[in-house]
């Protein structure tokens, strides 16, 4: 997929083990090492929020380095509203479960199933936060 975006270069790829404090530690370490980066993409909102906290602690202005998380959970939505995260990606757990159950039923019946089942993701930008907040009420 990156071949479609030749201007993007991955300079670090590490796991913060889905934890906010470890996301903060990793980002702090990159900053202390002098690693230059323009964006952080974290595989969940917790790690993204930790990265944002590290940048804030280092004196970086909100939005100076774009941070995107995944999940669109309430803490992630709040971080987007506060300008700490540029966006989050909502993974629809209900649609994922529905597709999984449908595939299981087909397997039980001996019917063929697709090798991959695509459940669309939704990008949550600041202007869409209110819509996603309603889903949690």
Each PLM stretch: what is its role?
Residues 1-137:
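A residue-level marker of the well-folded mature domains of exported/periplasmic proteins
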């Amino acid at each position: 997929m990156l071949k479609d975006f030749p201007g993007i270069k991955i300079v670090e790829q590490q796991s913060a083990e889905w934890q906010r404090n470890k996301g903060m530690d990793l980002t702090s370490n990159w900053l202390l090492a002098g690693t230059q980066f323009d964006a952080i993409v974290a595989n969940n909102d917790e790690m993204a929020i930790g990265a944002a906290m590290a940048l804030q602690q280092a004196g970086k202005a909100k939005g100076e380095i774009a941070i995107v998380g995944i999940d669109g959970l309430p803490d992630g939505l709040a971080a987007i509203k506060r300008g700490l995260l540029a966006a989050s990606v909502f993974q629809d757990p209900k649609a994922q479960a529905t597709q999984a159950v449908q595939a299981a039923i087909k397997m039980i019946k001996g019917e063929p199933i697709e090798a991959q089942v695509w459940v669309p993701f939704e990008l949550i930008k600041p202007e869409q936060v209110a819509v996603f907040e309603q889903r949690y009420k």
